[in-house]
Amino acid sequence: MENLGRKLVLAKQGKDLTRLMKDEAWQVRCEVAKNENNEVLDVLVKDENWMVRSEVLKHRRDSDLDILVNDKDHWIRSEVAEIGRDKDLDVLVKDKEFTVVLEVLKHNRKKDIDFLKNSDDFIIQSKLRKLNV
């Protein structure tokens, strides 16, 4: 049985990725996701571990963004908002998690600001006041 360190080295070198993308250790799958191998990324975008999905997201592939905009984890949705595709921001401005919405507001889109003016979330209202809107 290979040790974790050996598998991490192989993944970093871009070797044996199709085997390593199925490894039980999330650290190995994270390292695999750093490679720009579309076949591997297509699988890892649905990984159970949010840190693996976050690594996939760093490649900014449209197909991944289309999936991850609806991710169960608010940290992933915040990262999608940070990237700032208009169609994603249109979805995420209505997110129930304020951290996601705050990330949307960083793009200063007028339609988002107008939509959120009616929000009853104290934190969002505070952010809008800081934007002087």
Explain the meaning of each model-derived region.
Residues 1-133:
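Alpha-helical scaffold segments
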